C-alpha cells in the first residue's frame, strides 16, 4: 500500500506539472476528439481501466491514466524512419475503425513523421531541425527501423542533404527526453541485420549512449506503442525492463503462457501438417513450427486489427518476431526448432519434444483424475 501511495503521488505531481504546460495543439481536446469519433466518456474510461491493467498498475491508477491521455497533447514526438518497411507505423495508423489507442496517438503532438506529414525535401529537414531545437530535452523520440553503419552509414541516406540514417539517429537521440525503438528492426536490427548483414545494420541502442526502450514486434501492437507513451506521461521515467530492454508489462510472459491453444499442447494434441484434422480442431501448432514457447510478447491478449485476431488464432504458428535475431535463430518458421527443444520446469528443467511432453502430461492428467476421484469418494464417505 505504501508503494502504491508513493507511485500515485509521483504520477499526480507529474500530471500536474504537465497540465501547466500550454497545449501544443490549439483548440483541441480529448473530449472533442472522442465526440467526433462517436466514442463516449464511459468507453474512454473503460479504455483507461484496461490500459492501467495492461501497464500492470493498480486499479486506482485508472483516473490518472485517463488524465495522462488528456494531457498527451503536451508531449512533442519526433518519429524517425531508418531501414524498414513502415509496417510499425501502419500497425498504429491503418485501421478501418480506429480505436482509442490510435486516436490518442493522433492527439499527441507529432512534430515529425515522414509518412504522415505533407512537407518534403528541404522543408521536411527544416521541420525536423526546428522541432529538435524548439523542444530540446522535452521531446520523445521514436525510431522505426535498423540503422546501417557500414561505410559510415552510407547505405542509408535520407533527405535533400543526404544525411545518413546513422547521423540522424545519433543527433536526434542526443537531445531526447525518452527514446523508444519501435519494432524489431529498431530494437534488434531486424531483417536488415540478418546474416550476412552486408550493411552492418544495428539496433538503435548500438548507435547511441542514451537509454533506449525497445518495443519489438514485426509489427508491435498499437497498444504496446501507446502504452509506453502513457507510462512516460505518468511517471517521466523508464518502466521496469527485461534483459533486452523491453517493458516487462508487455514482454514479461511467453506467447505460450497465455495461448488459447495451450490446453491442446498440455494434452498432446498437435497439428501434424497445415490443413489436417488437428488444424481444423484448433490443436497446438508447435509441430508445424510455432515459436510461442521461446517468444515473449502479449499478442494473445491484445491481438491485431482492432483486437480481431492474431497469427495463432488465424492458424499459423508464432515466428518469434519480438526476439533478438529471430530471422537467423527461429527459422525455418514452419518447422520445430531441433536445436532448442522446449524447456519446462515440470520435468525438472529437462528438454522435451512435443510428443514427450504430451504423452507425459496425459499420464500425469490420468493420475490426477484418479486421485481426484479417490479424494471425492473419501469426502462422500465422511459426509
Positions of the model-derived regions?
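N-terminal secretory signal peptides
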Residues: 1-39, 67
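Juxtamembrane/start-of-transmembrane alpha-helix segments at the extracytoplasmic/lumenal side
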Residues: 347-360
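Alpha-helical transmembrane segments
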Residues: 364-377
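Extended, subdomain-level signal for the structured scaffold at the beginning of enzyme domains
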Residues: 45, 63-169, 368
